Amino acid sequence: MRVVGIGGTLRAGSSSERLARAVLAACEARGAEVRMFDGPHLARLPHFDPATPDRSPAEAELVEAVRTAHALVIASPGYHGGVSGLVKNAIDLLEDLRGDARPYFDGRPVGLIVLAAGWQAGGVTLAALRGIVHAMRGWPTPIGLAVNSIEQKPFDADGKLADAGIAAAVEAMATQLTQGVHPGA
């Protein structure tokens, strides 16, 4: 089973990236092969242009990883109540999967993570990601993770999950991702 993570910010080791990596680590502990496309990787992607079929090596690598994934994790900051441009550009690139026998995220579980400075931005951004995943024929996991970065501190000084509720949600999401994969997926 392969689980691919997409997300983060331009800052390596951002909280959204670290939460995605925590979910991937929990999936790996359940036997999955995992791969993360973090913010610095996503920053190398040119702006998506559907009229240009040629892809850079970084673009082709992301598209192929998602094409062969059994499940996905997408993590975004909730900038002003929306998905970051960095993450949205990566999602838009997956339009290249439209002609596949299994287009887009067809039938695959997708875990969604949002970190935002407030509950409203986090909830709205999580809802937007759920809508995107539905439009791309995927199945958002029942547990979605919206973290209020003002009121919640997911990690301690050593970088370990420090919030019991967030840690439980990470484990629940990993279970839903790995158990939501169907044979032949």
Regions inferred by a protein language model and the residue ranges of each:
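Short, glycine-/small-residue-rich phosphate/pyrophosphate-handling segment
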Residues: 106-148, 165
